[in-house]
Amino acid sequence: MGKKNKQFVEKITAMEDDFAQWYTDVVKQADLVDYGQVRGTMIIKPYGYAIWENIKNELDRMFKETGHTNVAFPLFIPESLLQKEKDHVEGFAPEVAWVTHGGEEELTERIAVRPTSEVLFCDYYSNNIHSYRDLPKLYNQWGNVVRWEKTTRPFLRSSEFHWQEGHTAHATDEEATEETNRMLETYAKLVEEYLAVPVLKGRKTDKEKFAGAKFTLTIEALMHDGKALQSGTSHHFGTGFAEAFDINYLDKDGKSQFVHQTSWGLSTRIMGALIMVHGDNRGLVVPPKIAPTQAMIVPIAQHKEGVLDKAYELRDKLAKVARVDIDGSDKMPGWKFNEYEMKGIPVRVEMGPKDIEKEQVVLVRRDTGEKEFVPVAEVETRLVELLDEVQSNLYQRALDHRNEMTTVAKDMDEFKEKIEEGGFIKAMWCGDVSCEESIKEETTATSRCIPYEEEKVADTCVCCGKKAKELVYWARAY
């Protein structure tokens, strides 16, 4: 048994030795995905999809609470429609997959497989918005999109991925700005409260903003290896798309006005954040609030009379307060321990003959490995408390890591030294895109966001030494 368990654990490369390989090992061994037949595609397996489904359900509930309605738009976009907004199409052109034939017949116009759906929503709005009474339009779509990526990795960057994309139209710039901010706050709430991942909130630089946007807001998370991951974005389009697609309405005075639009999206990329923020060398660690199974009961010496019966009684008891499962298979307990540690199930519940005799169970935390003996009469209450403790600890641990990995640089020598240590660097910037490009060229770090809270760590730009305009968080990123 010991040898089998050891071999099971050895399938994971230590993150300290090779973080990229550790990530790949966890994704595979935790049974989250398999590789698709086309390069860059993935099969999200039942356990991986169950986690995504819990994330999706929470987010969908939040959307509906803020008045949004779900819709489903086509997968295909005519080339002529995609090209209507110049900046937008240029931003996506290298990644677009094209349909050129229908059966044996060559199409007269190429059809894009949607990389995103702005132009489809704009075309719809141009035909369905006529009066101020038609506003606002608050739509969200769950679906998949295709972006023909050159370098791929499961969840983080794939040629096809699942996501939601919200598209809204408003009468005024102020309403659109309010919507852009509200949806970023919605993402931040989801990621921090449910995924236990702390995020930075801020605005993208003009160089990094979404193609065709007036401005882009972002949440940025820090991974265990010190790299950043953009985890959700919200875009204010102003009237740019409305002018390109002639989306106008008559206001209360009978005057024609262009609508103000937003879009916002969060994808299965957030699964990558979940893995790389909380995972360890034993595998995945899933926060209780989104865990498909919050507690797994493992009977010990289950072949002995009465053990399985008591374990199933316990399951029925705990199922009233949490998502609970039981492994009644004939696999050895050690194998089961490793299996559910690998899958990151928040709490393991052990029950054997001695525990039954003492009317107790053993609760084992996935995040710390700590064990505690709990009377059966108190186990429901204690499990609920313990799940809350695990959730809070995962968030605090990730926040402490981010704080430890956030430093300040006042000149390029200091910047170059600190970027090698990983993490976020707070540095002043003059606002000139040439400095932003120089920093990327010299260090491979990119601007992650201009934070909401104004802060000054120096008077001059970290790159050129001229008068600084604002503070920027920089990092190497996925």
UniProtKB/Swiss-Prot annotation:
The keyword Cell membrane is assigned to this record: no
Pfam families (alphabetical): HGTP_anticodon, ProRS-C_1, tRNA-synt_2b
Principal location listed in the UniProt entry: cytoplasm
Annotated compartments: Cytoplasm
Reaction catalysis annotation: tRNA(Pro) + L-proline + ATP = L-prolyl-tRNA(Pro) + AMP + diphosphate
Keywords, sorted A to Z: Aminoacyl-tRNA synthetase, ATP-binding, Cytoplasm, Ligase, Nucleotide-binding, Protein biosynthesis
Molecular function terms, GO-annotated: ATP binding; catalytic activity, acting on a protein; proline-tRNA ligase activity; transferase activity
Family matches, as InterPro entries: aa-tRNA-synt_IIb (IPR002314), aa-tRNA-synth_II (IPR006195), aa-tRNA-synth_II/BPL/LPL (IPR045864), Anticodon-bd (IPR004154), Anticodon-bd_dom_sf (IPR036621), Pro-tRNA-ligase_IIa (IPR002316), Pro-tRNA-ligase_IIa_arc-type (IPR004499), Pro-tRNA_ligase_II_C (IPR016061)
GO biological process: prolyl-tRNA aminoacylation
GO cellular component terms attached to this protein's record: aminoacyl-tRNA synthetase multienzyme complex; cytoplasm
EC number(s) per entry: 6.1.1.15
PANTHER family: BIFUNCTIONAL GLUTAMATE_PROLINE--TRNA LIGASE (PTHR43382:SF2), PROLYL-TRNA SYNTHETASE (PTHR43382)
Family membership noted in the UniProt record: Belongs to the class-II aminoacyl-tRNA synthetase family. ProS type 3 subfamily.
Self-association state and partner proteins as the record states: Homodimer.
UniProt xrefs under NCBIfam families: proS_fam_I
Functional summary from the UniProt entry: Catalyzes the attachment of proline to tRNA(Pro) in a two-step reaction: proline is first activated by ATP to form Pro-AMP and then transferred to the acceptor end of tRNA(Pro).
Domain-level remarks: Consists of three domains: the N-terminal catalytic domain, the anticodon-binding domain and the C-terminal extension.
Protein name as it appears in the record: Proline--tRNA ligase
Organism expressing this protein natively: Oceanobacillus iheyensis (strain DSM 14371 / CIP 107618 / JCM 11309 / KCTC 3954 / HTE831)
